[in-house]
Amino acid sequence: MLTEKGRGYDVAIKNPERFHGASPFDIETGKGAPAAPGTPPKYQDVMGETLLKLAREDANIVGITAAMPAGTGLNILEDALPNQFFDVGIAEEHAVLFAAGMATSGFHPVCAIYSTFLQRA
């Protein structure tokens, strides 16, 4: 059985990850509602921007995720430095072992996984 994300809502079908954990949005366009003035940045955005800054300075810094690039902020790294980004799919155990292998080869992996999914690792 395969999950079909967004079934019945064209905007979600075109971008299923965007609606995986949706916050308020315009139902016509699918665009997210603007943040209220003074709202602090999202943790994942701070993480992604910080990792990107570090990765630009060191090509051995890589980001690894298990099918959650936007939710972890690694989509920022993916967009800017795709050769330093790895999405292993829904395989947290592989992400952790992949990171360990890369570390033994001189890389500096950042493995971003939701804690609830680490039970699978």
Write out the residue ranges for each language-model feature.
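Thiamine diphosphate
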Residues: 1-121
